[in-house]
Amino acid sequence: MRVLDASRVLAGPYAAMMLGDLGHDVIKVEAPGTGDPTRAWGPPWQDGQSAYYLSINRNKRSLTLDLKSSEGQEIFRKLARQSDVLIENFHPGGMDGWGLGWEALSRLNPRLVYCSITGYGQTGPWKDRPAYDLALQAEAGWMSITGEAGAPPVRVGVAVIDLFTAHFAVQQILSALLDRERTGAGRRLDVSMLDSAIASLTYMAQNARATGEPPGRMGSRHPSIVPYQAFQAKDGWFVAAVGSQPIWERFCPAIGLPDLLTHPDFRDNPLRVKHRALLEALLAKVFAARPVAEWVALLTEHDVPAAPVNDLLAALELPSRPAAVRLPPPRLGEHTEEILGELGLR
């Protein structure tokens, strides 16, 4: 399957990369001379390239095209005729202005799945507003629930709205491709960052609806589960996630406090939520006495979810199953001649 990636920055390129990770031929279309803006987002740099760019553009080929020129537009149309999926994230109407919108390209290739990613959707009063992840984290309420109580707003440490949007885009693309097997027809997909941000709030949004009150910032704590947070040990921080009553019944003996099981304030989770401050104070004294590794090992032995709070270098050493890298992130225009040759233009 061929994917035409005419997107830039994060949400679109990440979606296209996920399709590349699945083994599909992804052609990244970039402006001559500058390319994707993230190529200039640094430091840090790695082998002369932006680390940011490298993180979201593996398993792609790079083609430079000036989509504002008639020649570039014609080459793009040739590619679209031979592609299964197109991903773009220009302002609504941007691709139409170049004769490369859904209406034009679907006439050339009725099987094309055309995915447009924007901040606020293709229609409606906000469609022309500019959008970056930070703005959506703020507007969709994410920054109101992130950080410590009483502290200034904090953004999530990575661009989660962009990443959620990419996952929703891939989900819709794969669904459209499956539907195409039945109907023979492609589809226009309208994926917005705002919709993705609101949908991903899940239980926090439902909590607000249920209570009529906006949730506040709680640091690492959970609004509905106690204890479920970070704790300070003798030499650092770790987390414990007591997400059910059976886990609570294993947790208390494991930490040497079996009497908590019969304490009238802690018998069940609603009571523990109500008396959160009292329980946290008791646990803080206990956990301060031993190092992180001992607590994590002990809790894990008793089947209680627990983990150290790692920095990223430590996290990257954890056992995992990384995506297969068939192609490293391409240099700007690295595959232009190759792709043009495939089109019979060289």
Q: What is each residue range found by the language model?
A:
Residues 1-182, 331, 335-346:
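N-terminal helix-loop segment corresponding to the beta1-alpha1 unit
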Residues 1-2, 216, 232, 297, ...:
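Terminal low-complexity tails and localization/encapsulation signals of metabolic enzymes
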Residues 33, 120-121, 193-198, 235-237, ...:
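Glycine-rich beta-alpha junction loops
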Residues 36-38, 208-215:
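Short Pro/Gly-enriched beta-strand edge/turn motifs at strand-loop
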Residues 60, 184, 320-322:
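Glycine-centered positions within short beta-strands or beta-hairpins
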Residues 122, 150-159, 181-197, 216-223, ...:
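Conserved Rossmann-fold dehydrogenase catalytic segment
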Residues 166-186, 199-211, 252-258:
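Oxidoreductase and adenylate-handling cofactor-binding alpha/beta cores
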Residues 221, 226-302, 306:
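Aromatic-enriched alpha-helical interface/lid elements that frame and gate functional surfaces
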